[in-house]
Amino acid sequence: MKHRNIVIVLLLVVAVPVAALAAAPAGRQRTAIGKLTIVADSWAGPLQGPWTWAGDVTITAGGSTLTAGTVKIWLEKGGQRIQRMEASGGVRLTGTYTMAPAGSPPADWKVDASAQEATYDGGTQTAVMTGKVALQATNTSTGEVVTARAGKATYNGKAQQFRFEQSGEPVQVQWQEPPAKAAGQ
């Protein structure tokens, strides 16, 4: 059961959809694409795309937030879905996500993941984080913590498979049990 939870948390973190935010500070560009809100120092590109946001980029959707130095987005024909996204310059993904694995009650996980770069391909539903990938996910009910460190993390949404890799070094994954409950709790 623990191993299934670890796998589900790792899948969730790498597969999390691009994320959510509040109002843009004065002087910053704010753009909405579908259910995404993007705030950055600048936004440029041809009308049909691709578009590039640069300078303290924050993308929000739902309860998730993605931050990076630069983000480039290509939209599918019709402009309603992301065909491809590239983020670079200190990429960070945060949010709280609910999981309900088969046979287990739903659980909320607070997630914080970072990497130097990240890409997403909408056609293959593949997300890749590269360069000092670090992940921490905490079960908000039990206090269980999963951490992972790797050089690269890949998630294929269609196949629902993930892979953490580290060139020449082992991938590091740690599971911390929840704190023991005192008698009578």
Predicted segment positions?
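Mature-chain termini and adjacent capping regions
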Residues: 1-185
